[in-house]
Structures are given as structure tokens and as C-alpha cells.
């Protein structure tokens, strides 16, 4: 993500992965970070941890989604055989970057839609791989190499 100073990011979801996602966004230089969740209390909890967050009510998501440059799905929506968002993302900016923390399936319905519309999309596979690498190192003090062969193997197994 380039020229982050004036970018606006939205984290959809306020569960377990959200704090790490928020910190990563902040480290990238994006200053304007919002969060939304089906349960508003979880957003309020995150706002207490990260006072710089703006809370977007879930009911306003459909109309607000067009205001963001980076959108991260940190919910369970789209998981294998699971529900997906009950609205589409047609009003997102053409240059939006959509990141889905889900890696199984590799492409959720929302991911597929945005990809077909020509938006930049990334799934959660890299996060999964590098999280595994870090965990392996913490347990074994060995840093396993991540190469194209490993990525292809995981891609084939998750399809």
C-alpha cells in the first residue's frame, strides 16, 4: 500500500484477529482507521484499546463502504460453507484494496465478486503461512523457509 497518509482503512469485524490487523494498518502509516462489527459492544471494546479508531455502525456499512481505500474482512463471514455479507460491495472505490483474513476457502463470495470487478484482492493465506512460520520458530527455534512450492502446496490443499 503506497501513499498511506491520506488513505482510509476499514476493519470489518472486532474479534480475535482484529487487534493485530489494526496494529498492522497503523504501522503501514494509515492514520484514518475505522472498525465495524455486527455487535457494537466489541467495537467499543476495541476503541478502548485503540483510541484512534472510528466506529462505523453495522447498519451504516452499506452506505459508508464507498469511503474507504483499504477494507479488511476480519470476520468469520465467508468461511467454508458459511454465510457471507448480506450486501454487495458494488459501491467500493475502483482502486480499493480488499484483504480477506479467511484462507479456507481461498476465495469467499465477496473476494470473488471484487476480483471479477477488477479490484485488488488478497486472501488470508499469507497471514496463515507467516503465522505458522512464527509459531514454528517460537516452539523450535528454527525458522522454516517459505517458498513457492509450499505456497502452491497449500493452495492445492485448500481448493
Per-segment meaning from a language model:
Residues 5-26, 30:
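Glycine-rich adenosine-cofactor-binding loop
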Residues 23-27, 45-48, 112, 116:
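Short, well-ordered alpha-helices that flank and scaffold nucleotide-derived cofactor binding pockets
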Residues 28-50:
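NAD(P)-binding Rossmann-fold cofactor-contacting core
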Amino acid at each position: 500500500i503506497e501513499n498511506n497518509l491520506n488513505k482510509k482503512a476499514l476493519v470489518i469485524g472486532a474479534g480475535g484477529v482484529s487487534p493485530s490487523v489494526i496494529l498492522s494498518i497503523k504501522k503501514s502509516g494509515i492514520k484514518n482507521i475505522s472498525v465495524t462489527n455486527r455487535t457494537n459492544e466489541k467495537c467499543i471494546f476495541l476503541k478502548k484499546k485503540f483510541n484512534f479508531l472510528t466506529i462505523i455502525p453495522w447498519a451504516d456499512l452499506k452506505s459508508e463502504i464507498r469511503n474507504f481505500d483499504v477494507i479488511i474482512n476480519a470476520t468469520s463471514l465467508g468461511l467454508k460453507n458459511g454465510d457471507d455479507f448480506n450486501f454487495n460491495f458494488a459501491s467500493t472505490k475502483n482502486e480499493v484494496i480488499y484483504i480477506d483474513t479467511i484462507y479456507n476457502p481461498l476465495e469467499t463470495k465477496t473476494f470473488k465478486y471484487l476480483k471479477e470487478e477488477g479490484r485488488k484482492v488478497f486472501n488470508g493465506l499469507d497471514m496463515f503461512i507467516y503465522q505458522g512460520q512464527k509459531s514454528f520458530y517460537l516452539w523450535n527455534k528454527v525458522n522454516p523457509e517459505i517458498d513457492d512450492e509450499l505456497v502452491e502446496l497449500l493452495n492445492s490443499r485448500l481448493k
